[in-house]
């Protein structure tokens, strides 16, 4: 999803705008 691995599929929306 995002380049940050800490960002899960669920957190992808808030991690990557």
UniProtKB/Swiss-Prot annotation:
It comes from the Eukaryota. GO terms for molecular function: toxin activity. Its main location: secreted. The modification 4-hydroxyproline is found at residue 17. Expressed by the venom duct. GO terms for cellular component: extracellular region. Keywords: Disulfide bond, Hydroxylation, Secreted, Toxin. The keyword Nucleus does not apply. It is found in: Secreted. Disulfide bonds join 1-16, 2-12, 7-15. The cysteine framework is III (CC-C-C-CC). Belongs to the conotoxin M superfamily. This is Conotoxin reg3i. It comes from Conus regius.
